[in-house]
UniProtKB/Swiss-Prot annotation:
It comes from Mus musculus. It holds the Pfam family CTP_synth_N. Pathway: Pyrimidine metabolism; CTP biosynthesis via de novo pathway; CTP from UDP: step 2/2. The gene is Ctps2. This is CTP synthase 2. One of its GO terms (biological process) is 'de novo' CTP biosynthetic process.
Length: 586
């Protein structure tokens, strides 16, 4: 097993996750089996209870793990399915060690950070690195580990010390350290500054780790003189200093790394069994990046949510829309609309903001209402849904978005004016959306319904069923407590709003479609978590196709085209995917 540790310096948020994912993509393109681990030094057990404004989106894995959004990058770039134990937190490590101490596993010894915490970290990494993540059930050959935060943070000291010890345990030929650092370029002088990187590497070396590769993040390509200066002061060869400057899309990052010869250096330093790295995967990646930059047609989607002030809150939603737009050769124009801005209270307090929000909504080719919690902003979402339904604007509702779509239809089309969710009004006379908990024993706790669940299609006449390739069932990831009340489903009989997907027991309503509408779909699950750059999520793809007027053409041609996995030579997906590039789209 080979281990590649990615650390960061100067500031956080400079792209360690994307760089780690890109390195994994390059190695996978060389025919190697790659897994990934993200270390978050916070004391929380997982990301499940975070405020969206604190850490952005909570990414959900197949096994129900609620993790950092960087694991979403790993899954999307590498086309793998990770587990909750691929996300290590300080809280998990301490809980693990304390539980062992309570059981008496340490035989009365004094339990300390060194060696007990550091040993637990190393043991966790070694065990999880062996777990297959690509569906082939073969052990990974390389584990890419991202250490969150920056070198010098007090929260991460135990992890740095653990890897200082681990480099000797794994042996030099199996351990590789990549340090990502910022090279700022002040606008006043325009000169690229190396001092922050020098100090960062000095701090890293002072803690016992020496970088094998320094990745410089900068706004523009770094000059050779800057590279040589970093090389001299940081005790590495010039070819061990590479630059990842700001690019038009993140799909360029693996190509930038590959162009600068990292594969050859990995091969020599780690003794990797690489014969030819010019694989079909890297060619596809380059073609996708080139196509992204050539896009001319624009599709505008309005995202109506309550966490729009921080874009990371909807990171996977944005990626899923981007994947779908790219698949049909359109550039995505995603317009974030705070749902409160659509409400009458905003009209009274700030008329300009109110009218700007409604203008965005009116200009949108499609409308998306994503998941969320709490009553704040729900009135604005209901108004956006009503606009989409009555004006025949393509609409996709995710989780809460689906629940609100059902409530809006019941109030305005079934004359059930009191229809509501018990989340917002516990004593509502018409509890259309109710708490349907699923007990989750263990650390995830609570009553959240989490992870991969099967949805069975109940009708052949479903747009979404066709988009998934006419399969009898699908498996998607969930994260919710509330669902449509199955006891009130009979109210919708012989109406346009049809429940076309249910869970395996037929008790939970998973998919709803409005038959009299070009594309009005709600799903209880979160399909964005399964979207991949070369395998877009069908519900999102349908929204983009409908918004560009190509849905019917796509559905007609799906039956004529062969199905294939658009990413690699093997796939364990529960649905096939048409070759979108062959579709005759306008």
């Amino acid at each position: 097993m080979k281990y590649i540790l990615v650390t960061g310096g100067v500031i956080s948020g400079i792209g360690k996750g994307i760089i780690a994912s890109s390195i994994g993509t390059i190695l996978k393109s060389c025919g190697l089996r790659v897994t990934a681990i993200k270390i978050d030094p916070y004391i929380n057990i997982d990301a499940g209870t975070f405020s969206p404004y604190e850490h952005g989106e909570v990414f959900v894995l197949n096994d129900g793990g609620e993790v950092d959004l960087d694991l979403g990058n790993y899954e999307r770039f590498l086309d793998i399915n990770l587990y909750k134990d691929n996300n290590i937190t300080t809280g998990k490590i301490y809980q693990h060690v304390i539980n062992k101490e309570r059981r008496g596993d340490y035989l009365g010894k004094t339990v300390q950070v060194v060696p007990h915490i550091t040993d637990a970290i190393q043991e966790w990494v070694m065990n999880q690195a062996k777990v297959s993540v690509d569906g082939n059930k073969e052990d990974p050959q390389i584990c890419v580990i991202e250490l969150g935060g920056t070198i010098g943070d007090i929260e991460g000291m135990a992890f740095v010390e653990a890897f200082r010890q681990f480099q000797f345990k794994a042996k030099k030929e199996n351990f590789y350290n990549i340090h990502v650092s910022l090279v700022p370029q002040p606008s006043a002088t325009g000169e690229q500054k190396t001092k922050p990187t020098q100090n960062s590497v000095r701090a890293l070396r002072g803690l016992g780790l020496s970088p094998d590769l320094i990745v410089c993040r900068s706004s523009t390509p770094i000059e050779m003189a800057v590279k040589e200066k970093i090389s001299m002061f940081c005790h590495v060869n010039p070819e061990q200093v590479i630059c990842i400057h700001d690019v038009s899309s993140i799909y360029r990052v693996p190509l930038l790394l590959e162009e600068q010869g990292v594969v050859k250096y990995f091969q020599e330093r780690l003794g990797l069994p690489i014969n030819d790295c010019s694989s079909n995967l890297l060619f596809k990646w380059k073609a996708m990046a080139d196509r992204y930059e050539r896009l001319q047609k624009i599709c505008s989607i309005a995202l109506v949510g309550k966490y729009t002030k921080l874009r990371d809150c909807y990171a996977s939603v944005f990626k899923a829309l981007e994947h779908s737009a790219l698949a049909i050769n359109h550039k995505l124009n995603l317009m974030y609309i705070d749902s409160i801005d659509l409400e009458p209270v905003t009209k009274a307090e700030d008329p300009v903001k109110f009218h700007e929000a409604w203008q965005k909504l009116c200009l949108a080719d499609g409308i998306l209402v994503p998941g969320g919690f709490g009553i704040r902003g729900t009135l604005g979402k209901l108004q956006a849904i009503s606009w989409a339904r009555t004006k025949k604007i393509p609409f996709l509702g995710i989780c809460l978005g689906m629940q609100l779509a059902v409530i809006e239809f019941a109030r305005n089309c079934l004359n059930l004016k009191d229809a509501n969710s018990t989340e917002f009004e516990p004593n509502t006379p018409v509890p259309l959306v109710i708490d349907m908990p699923e007990h989750n024993p263990g650390d995830l706790g609570g009553t959240m319904r989490l992870g991969l669940r099967r949805t069975v299609f109940t009708t052949e006449n479903s747009i979404l069923k066709k988009l998934y390739g006419d399969v009898p069932y699908i498996e998607e990831r969930h994260r919710h407590r509330y669902e449509v009340n199955p006891n009130l489903i009979n109210q919708f009989e012989n109406k346009d709003l049809c429940f076309v997907g249910e869970d395996v027991d037929g008790k939970r309503m998973e998919i709803v479609e409005l038959t009299s509408h070009p594309y009005f779909i709600g799903v209880q699950f979160h399909p964005e978590f399964s979207s991949r750059p070369m395998k877009p999520s069908p519900p999102y793809l349908g929204l983009l196709l409908a918004a560009t007027g190509n849905l019917n053409a796509h559905l007609q041609q799906m039956n004529k085209l062969p199905y294939s996995d658009g990413y690699s030579d093997a796939s364990d997906d529960s649905f096939p995917e048409a070759k979108l590039a062959e579709l005759d789209l306008n």
